[in-house]
Amino acid sequence: MRGLGKGSSAITVVNAFATGKGGAIGIDLWTEAKVKITDGEVKGKILVNGLEFNDFRVVNAVLDVMRRYSGIEFGIEFEINSEIPVGKGLKSSSAVANALVEAIARALRLNIPGIKVVKLGVEAAKKAGVTLTGAFDDACASYFGGLCLTDNLRVELLKRIEIDELPVVILVPNETVLTEELKGVDFLKIAPYVEEAFKLAIKGEWKKALVLNGLIYSTFLSYPPEPISKALHLGAVVGLSGKGPSVFAITDEPERIEEVWREFGDVIITSTR
């Protein structure tokens, strides 16, 4: 029995670290998982932009969660191909979890509603230790697309807003920041300000929300201000994705942003979905 699943990257509108409530927008960068059900053996590979990635925590956690959910003891042969950079704030873990849960569900012929696929993926991400809040906002945006606003503590989708297909430029610095590295940071210090950003997002003013969120978190986490500053000067809507270090810009002139960001790291041009 075989199955195929997909999950996309996403960009942050409001980071849930400070308040437990967050929002993200799906973008057109993908992770694909192919699985074959076996009698018990677990083997496979993860490729990120063609390079082998040897952290299998999310895979093992998804397998545990799906065994328990289905009541079936099984193994898998898997191949995961991703075009989402890891440790850059671009929801790579959410995309892998969604893709793998969906692939296993299809292989086992389980009819699971989309929101349950997402919740199983979030459970696995928590189990794997790759999220501080459960990242339900990221997981919803990865699975459903559009803007998803959530209460991550209650695992509740509060609002989903369709987003037009808009050009997105992503700056991917060389630095990698893993979520587990932030466990000692007291994000409550910025909670009152992040709460205001979330209120804007719920009202539909998500562009204002993501700029405010980006300024708050990038300053609090001491990221260099130049990339955001340069993009704001060009009239772009600019934010920090997740915990960073990736910065993104929504703009009608992606080539201009790409030009000024090249000195800071790799640049990807994609779109919202």
UniProtKB/Swiss-Prot annotation:
Key word Cell division present: no
Principal subcellular localisation of the protein: cytoplasm
Location in the cell: Cytoplasm
EC number: 2.7.1.71
Any GO CC annotation of this UniProt entry: cytoplasm
Molecular function terms from GO: ATP binding; shikimate kinase activity
InterPro entries in alphabetical order: GHMP_kinase_C_dom, GHMP_kinase_C_sf, GHMP_kinase_N_dom, Ribosomal_Su5_D2-typ_SF, Ribsml_uS5_D2-typ_fold_subgr, SK_arc
Keyword terms of this UniProt record: Amino-acid biosynthesis, Aromatic amino acid biosynthesis, ATP-binding, Cytoplasm, Kinase, Nucleotide-binding, Transferase
SUPFAM superfamilies recorded: GHMP Kinase, C-terminal domain, Ribosomal protein S5 domain 2-like
One BP annotation, GO: aromatic amino acid family biosynthetic process
Any single Pfam family the record assigns to this protein: GHMP_kinases_C
Domain of life, per lineage: Archaea
Reaction equations catalysed: shikimate + ATP = 3-phosphoshikimate + ADP + H(+)
PANTHER family: HOMOSERINE/4-DIPHOSPHOCYTIDYL-2-C-METHYL-D-ERYTHRITOL KINASE, SHIKIMATE KINASE
Family to which the UniProt record says this protein belongs: Belongs to the GHMP kinase family. Archaeal shikimate kinase subfamily.
The name this protein goes by in its record: Shikimate kinase
Species of origin: Pyrococcus furiosus (strain ATCC 43587 / DSM 3638 / JCM 8422 / Vc1)
